[in-house]
């Protein structure tokens, strides 16, 4: 399905004057992943922002629920002149990026042959390539805003596929795989939970740096050619991972910026709405979203 065809589904968004049009983007291996596109108006050409959360799975059901329950961020982006889309992609494969290497596509018997299956960040690549063909989207101004694992996806995407986005925001990026983090038993409150990211105590940046493969992380970051804003959360147990991700970007001479706020909610830049589309948003959440939009405004300005 081409993005200028009729969408697969049209979702009403509580509290919004704009519907969400669900399209299916063909993945690199010939399957399909959904995204729910909203544009500020029916006419015009707009910069576009991918919205992503977590480590995948759930398909259309997850996507439809997310569109309805997390419309505050989309309304803010639409009001600022951005098209945007909640997206869903395949489930993360543990250490798939680290061990899988670059995706190589060959040919056998007149058909494609791959050295591995595409990964979740390559589903985002497929979505970006698909939406770039939409008549309402400015293909030269694509961006990413992702939280948690979807923050790490930005690093993976920008490292493996330079130039796909103009800019990106990684919020509380769970970059343990990208940084090749090797935690020790002492990094967990309960040593029996070793290996579970949710149980790691990685608030201190120097502690994280000592446990990362810094040379490999820098090598991966050397390919990143787009501005990235990293947003942390002051008291998060993984704040050291978030901060080190920024520091290594800056040390690699990348265009990197850092911000962090004190907030009790993981993923606080994506406030949840009730059934009427009303969100209980506090000043900290609005300040963080303001900073994201300001970053996008700066880096997605029309090309001269």
Language-model region placement:
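C-terminal catalytic histidine-bearing segment of alpha/beta-hydrolase fold enzymes
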Residues: 255-304
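N-terminal cap/lid segment of alpha/beta-hydrolase-fold proteins
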Residues: 2-43
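Short substrate-entry loop that stabilizes the transition state in hydrolases
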Residues: 44-46, 54-94, 238
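Alpha/beta-hydrolase active-site loop
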Residues: 102-135
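Primarily recognizes the serine-hydrolase "nucleophile elbow" in alpha/beta-hydrolase
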Residues: 126-186
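Short beta-strand/loop motif that positions the catalytic acidic residue
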Residues: 224, 230-232
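Conserved alpha/beta-hydrolase "acid-adjacent" motif
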Residues: 237-243
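Mobile cap/lid helix-loop segments that gate and shape the active-site cleft of serine hydrolases
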Residues: 166-220
């Amino acid at each position: 399905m081409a993005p200028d065809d009729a969408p697969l589904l049209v979702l009403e968004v509580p509290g919004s004057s704009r519907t969400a049009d669900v399209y299916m983007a063909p993945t690199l291996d010939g399957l399909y992943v959904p995204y729910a596109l909203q544009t500020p108006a029916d006419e015009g050409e707009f910069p576009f922002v991918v919205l992503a959360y977590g480590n995948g799975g759930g398909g259309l059901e997850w996507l439809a629920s997310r569109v309805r329950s997390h419309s505050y961020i989309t309304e803010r982006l639409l009001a600022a002149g951005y098209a945007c889309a909640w997206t869903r992609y395949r489930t993360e494969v543990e250490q798939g990026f680290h061990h899988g290497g670059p995706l190589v596509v060959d040919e056998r018997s007149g058909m494609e042959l791959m050295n591995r299956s595409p990964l979740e960040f390559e589903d985002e690549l497929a979505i970006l390539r698909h939406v770039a063909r939409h008549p309402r989207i400015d293909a030269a101004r694509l961006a990413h805003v992702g939280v948690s694992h979807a923050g790490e996806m930005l690093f993976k995407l920008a490292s493996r596929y330079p130039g796909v986005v103009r800019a990106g925001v990684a919020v509380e990026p769970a970059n343990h795989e990208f940084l090749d983090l090797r935690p020790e038993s002492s990094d967990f409150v309960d040593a029996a939970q070793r290996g579970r990211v949710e149980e790691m105590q990685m608030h201190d940046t120097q502690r994280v740096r000592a446990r990362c493969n810094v040379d490999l992380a820098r090598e991966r970051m050397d390919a990143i050619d787009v501005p990235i804003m990293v947003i942390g959360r002051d008291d998060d147990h993984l704040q050291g991972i978030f901060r080190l991700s920024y520091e290594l970007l800056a040390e690699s001479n990348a265009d990197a910026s850092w911000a962090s706020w004190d907030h009790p909610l993981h993923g606080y830049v994506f406030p949840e709405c009730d059934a009427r589309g009303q969100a209980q948003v506090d000043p900290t959440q609005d300040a963080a979203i303001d900073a994201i939009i300001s970053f996008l405004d700066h880096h997605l300005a029309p090309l001269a």
